[in-house]
Amino acid sequence: MNYSHTPAGYNSFSEYYDALMQNVGYDERCRYILEIFKRLDHDMGLSLDLACGTGSLTIELKKNGVDVYGIDASYDMLSHAREKAEENGLDILFLCQKMQSIDLYGTIDTCVCTLDSINHLVKMSDVQKTFERVSLFMNQGGYFLFDANTIYKHREVLADNTFVYDTDDVFCVWQNSLKENNIVEIELDFFEREGKVYYRESENFCERAYSDEELTTMLEKAGFEVVKRYGDMTFEAPKSDEQRVIYVARKK
């Protein structure tokens, strides 16, 4: 059976994305990324935030002096990103392109792709294409940093479980269904209160977890070598029950 999603959609998700992600801590994640590259003695130079969503990390990187621009496949996500950048008085370029077919104006020195964006590609061929496109525009010696949800997380944490998120802005029911090939089908129901009435909107998409061997092999085929693997937000090797792994790959 084939599973797919259309990232150009996310109409409802884009409206509530920031509310659901308010505990991510983008400033802390930005500092973490900067520290990784500091330890590698790498000048980020011209950088790309791939699958940037509503631009929260892009904005934090820009605030910290990184020459960065963002790409996402969702017009709706990018609309919010542009508004937020303007509110922060920042001039950031945002482009609407799919990960697996990015076409940049020139080369880059660094690419970051965070918060399980790679997992949204449920076809291995699309992951390979994404790695190859990033490699095509990456200067030799440049770095590609991304994170990925693990098979453990998909099988043991998300699985067939349901989660509820209750914020000041929205009430969300997050339902997961574990399918073949470590794919999780995700159904989101958003309930927004206006007076005494609740309005419901729904969104659904799929994510796929890949093994370390699969990701490493695809990176090598694209001309990268993995130089670091960390447990999320740490500088230690991933544990057996790690839910998200950070990959740092260098362009050969």
Question: What residue ranges belong to the model's regions?
Answer:
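Class I SAM-dependent methyltransferase SAM/SAH-binding core
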Residues: 48, 56-101
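C-terminal lobe and adjacent flexible extensions of AdoMet/dcAdoMet transferase-like proteins
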Residues: 212-252
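A short glycine-rich, Lys/Arg-flanked "PGG" loop and its adjoining helix->strand segment in the class I
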Residues: 128-140
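Conserved class I S-adenosyl-L-methionine
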Residues: 1-51
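A short acidic, Gly/Pro-enriched loop at the edge of an enzyme's catalytic core
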Residues: 103-110
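SAM-dependent methyltransferase
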Residues: 125, 145-218
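Residues lining the SAM
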Residues: 114-116
